[in-house]
Amino acid sequence: VDFFAELEKAIKDSWPKPKLLVLNFPGNPTTQCVELDFIEKMIEIDSENEIWVIHDIAYPDNAFDGYKSPSILKVPGAIEVAAEFYSLSKSYNMPGWRVGFMSGNSSLVAALARMKSYLDYGMFTPIQVAAITALEGPQDCVHKITETYRSRRNVLCDGLNSLGWKVEKPRATMFVWAPIPEVYRHLGSLEFSKKLLSEARVAVSPGIGFGEYGDDHVRFGLIENEHRTRQAIRGIRDMFRNDQKFVSVGGGIP
């Protein structure tokens, strides 16, 4: 399937005409990553069709194995049609502080500023000061956080693969988007998630929660340390053994 051809066809066939396209790379929940040439093509298509573009880039710093997440604003001409949302939640370990910023096309930025003036009174000043300090200070913390996620990713993915549950290591984000093993796929993601919770004591997000096309996946969050992650893998291993229909093919749990 030619993604860009399908996108252009969807734009052409839609009525009313789309006004805005939202991109999310690295993606949540799929962890999908793209290179700059993909972004360039998206800007070309959207410019030709006079569509605004919003890029939700929450995980640019949580990238592994040499991958670098491209900003949409690196593309020449993108400023004419695009804006980007950046969050400090993952890069600076500030989830719940609800702090980030928008940059890009001045009309889009002004529209958001006007809308927010109707909805709230601005962010608590100490949070703004903390965000400025994080952005302007030493960035060692960002590298440390990314290394923590990378280590957790490796333990989880290596452990699942050692059980015969084939998953790919994501190149970015703090998630693993895991296809449900074939022998359990008939359950769907919600029932399989319930089974993991009750029998393996492992909590995951059912893919159906992200849309119907996610129903053959579950999402793991890299939010527990390596020791707890190994405990989770042992719980999954025991569930597989008890079911006697999914056989471990690997060595041990790393």
What are these regions (language model features)?
Residues 1-254:
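PLP-dependent class I/II
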